[in-house]
Amino acid sequence: MGKIIGIDLGTTNSCVAIMDGTKARVLENSEGDRTTPSIIAYTQDGETLVGQPAKRQAVTNPQNTLFAIKRLIGRRFQDEEAQRDKDIMPYKIIAADNGDAWLEVKGQKIAPPQISAEVLKKMKKTAEDYLGEPVTEAVITVPAYFNDAQRQATKDAGRIAGLEVKRIINEPTAAALAYGLDKEVGNRTIAVYDLGGGTFDISIIEIDEVDGEKTFEVLATNGDTHLGGEDFDSRLINYLVEEFKKDQGMDLRTDPLAMQRLKEAAEKAKIELSSAQQTDVNLPYITADGSGPKHMNIKVTRAKLESLVEDLVNRSIEPLKVALQDAGLSVSDIQDVILVGGQTRMPMVQKKVADFFGKEPRKDVNPDEAVAIGAAVQGGVLSGEVKDVLLLDVTPLSLGIETMGGVMTPLITKNTTIPTKHSQVFSTAEDNQSAVTIHVLQGERKRAQDNKSLGQFNLDGIQPAPRGMAQIEVTFDIDADGILHVSAKDKNTGREQKITIKASSGLNEEEIQKMVRDAEANAEADRKFEELVQTRNQADHLIHGTRKQLEEAGDKLPAEDKTAIEDAVKALEAALKSEDKAEIEAKTQALVQVSGKLLEMAQQQAAAGGDAGDTSAKKEDDVVDAEFEEVKDKK
């Protein structure tokens, strides 16, 4: 059985880890970094860039550089959050035919899971390069407060990337696994405060240890799927735009290029202000008007940044209170507080959390890597590599159906341990009713329309009977991924209807299969491109070496040989301008053949030089030959 890798698919950055024996190891990507920016760019010449290369070219290609896509995954276009992003993002957010929030790039409609799949493919490739074998299975993390549609969309992204998603687990739970696995923690109750690039979660988790077996039980979870570092950046960007407008009378919001430069500078300034009291946002030639170029140079203090984002930090405190209340605990019952997510490096966030819990958060958990490590641990549990670990997670939101009068009737309440199954008997609302519509909802509001609609289906063929007499048994079954399966059964006739909830939006099977095929086709195109580049590089190398040898040979080489070699070099240079790999290879081979005489001369010269060297280099008696042993890196 191959490795089940652990992937933290983040809003801002993503990370991949594997189990290496009993320890989880975070893997470095092809750029040598342990985290990869969750950024995808589509270039003018049709290339798809992922991670750091995409981030580097964002300034010159803002409309086709996609970031923070996790905030849109599994969302409807009309959702308040999607509408908010539509107004501030440099790329185009559109409504898909089914009402989902999609993106438009270079005239093409793309679903968020397709874009996230590009990041997952890079994570998959990173693991394959390290392991030296194909990877087909993964555990992927999601914010604890993700609803069913968002979880399903994340699973779809995994499939499009060529991964079988063995489990979807919640990010705070993964962080708790990373914290608790290698520490002798005994029995503890911990709070995981996870403020990432786009989402916020709080989970209260109990770790019990009995005879060496550790049980991680989530007691309660809460959060906000549209609160994170991106919002902090936006506040600083807006402030800088307004200051520049006051100073220069120009609104940078109309200039996508300037806004992309400003976004990068704001993120950098925010990070610097975690360790410094003030910083300068210095952007020469940010824009220009009739009078010439304009420069931005604005001083930002830590106090200023804190005043801009204080309400965002405060917004994270209310869910802490609710989570503690749901767990039936008080602040004094929490033994350890763990901070996860890059935004928790901000001193103000750390102080607010410390003030709330009355204790300093732990600093021995890496906020960028803990979630991926936990996902790898869960992968190890599923593959049997990790023993003596039991994980009991919960569903973050109540699940129910719409009943008479537009009321939401919960069947499974929030913070119920999963997997779980619950049935309830309902009846008809009218005489001789022959069909019922089961409308499945997720949320905490009493009025059905105020909750998230997960989908609906009909149960027909009900025997005619007076109102209230028919017995319809509705069963909700949540699997370990937190994904819902619903069935409705007429107890009188035994007639049954079942569905796995796919949000009334979401991708259908046909769309997913098409995206999987497209991804495979792209992988083939990428492989061919890589081979072409290698062939070109070899040809370049040969041209350079041949020219050098021609110079060194001088008049010793017969004129006809020299002409033949120069003609072959020119032919190869012409072939290099094409995209034809076979043509480049043929011309490379032709050059190798005609330059045989040149190679012969070079070898003779080298041999002559070597003989001369031997006569002069007598071995000293007091020099000892060093013994060495080649040590190969263990991969």
From Swiss-Prot:
It holds the Pfam family HSP70. It comes from Yersinia enterocolitica serotype O:8 / biotype 1B (strain NCTC 13174 / 8081). Keywords: ATP-binding, Chaperone, Nucleotide-binding, Phosphoprotein, Stress response. InterPro entries: ATPase_NBD (IPR043129), Chaperone_DnaK (IPR012725), Heat_shock_70_CS (IPR018181), HSP70_C_sf (IPR029048), HSP70_peptide-bd_sf (IPR029047), Hsp_70_fam (IPR013126). The gene is dnaK. SUPFAM superfamilies: Actin-like ATPase domain, Heat shock protein 70kD (HSP70), C-terminal subdomain, Heat shock protein 70kD (HSP70), peptide-binding domain. Induction: By stress conditions e.g. heat shock. The modification Phosphothreonine is found at residue 199. GO terms for molecular function: ATP binding; ATP-dependent protein folding chaperone; unfolded protein binding. Belongs to the heat shock protein 70 family. Residues 602-635 are annotated as: Disordered. The keyword Nucleotide-binding applies. NCBIfam families: PRK00290.1, PRK05183.1, prok_dnaK. Acts as a chaperone. This is Chaperone protein DnaK.
